[in-house]
From Swiss-Prot:
SMART domains: NDK
Disulfide bridge positions per record: none
Cofactors (names): Mg(2+)
The name this protein goes by in its record: Nucleoside diphosphate kinase
CDD domains named among the record's database cross-references: NDPk_I (cd04413)
Protein keywords: ATP-binding, Cytoplasm, Kinase, Magnesium, Metal-binding, Nucleotide metabolism, Nucleotide-binding, Phosphoprotein, Transferase
Length: 152
């Protein structure tokens, strides 16, 4: 059975605040498989493509400035229902609206510094994965405990 994949990025504020391990751990404990991981300071071109849907919005320039201000941890996670589940783990875009127990609910306060990005649907996930990763950077592998996490 082919598993779904999603793109997740820990933004510069999450990296600077030392939250990478905490965030990775939440996805791993949930049972998702990490198939792509890299640290990169995005170029303005990459940021512009990533946030292209917001190009005409007044906050676009600030978004690009912020995401290019420092290192980002770009990840691809794989698992059954990973896109929707990742969105639940991440929490509402506005941290003050995010439920306690979510990444943003526990670790963020301000919408402009909300720590993490996650794809919002299958088409977006595929676009973002292809934008940030080459096929060679993604690893197909089988965790030794897979039968304990996923019913066949």
């Amino acid at each position: 059975m082919a598993m779904e994949r999603t793109f997740v990025a820990i933004k510069p504020d999450g990296v600077q605040r030392g939250l990478v391990g905490e965030i990775l751990g939440r996805f791993e404990r949930k049972g998702f498989k990490l198939v792509g991981l890299k640290q990169v300071t995005p170029s303005r071109d990459l940021a512009g493509e990533h946030y292209g849907v917001h190009r005409e919005r007044p906050f676009f320039a600030g978004l690009v400035d912020f995401i290019t201000s420092g290192p980002v941890i770009a990840m691809v996670w794989e698992g059954d229902g990973v896109i929707a589940s990742a969105r639940k783990l991440i929490g509402a875009t506005k941290p003050l609206d995010a439920e306690p127990g979510t990444i943003r609910g526990d670790l963020a306060v301000n919408i402009g510094r909300n720590v993490i990005h996650g794809s919002d649907g299958p088409d977006t996930a595929q676009f973002e994965i292809n934008l940030w990763f080459s096929a060679e950077e993604l690893n197909a592998w089988t965790p030794s405990d897979q039968s304990w996490r996923i019913e066949s």
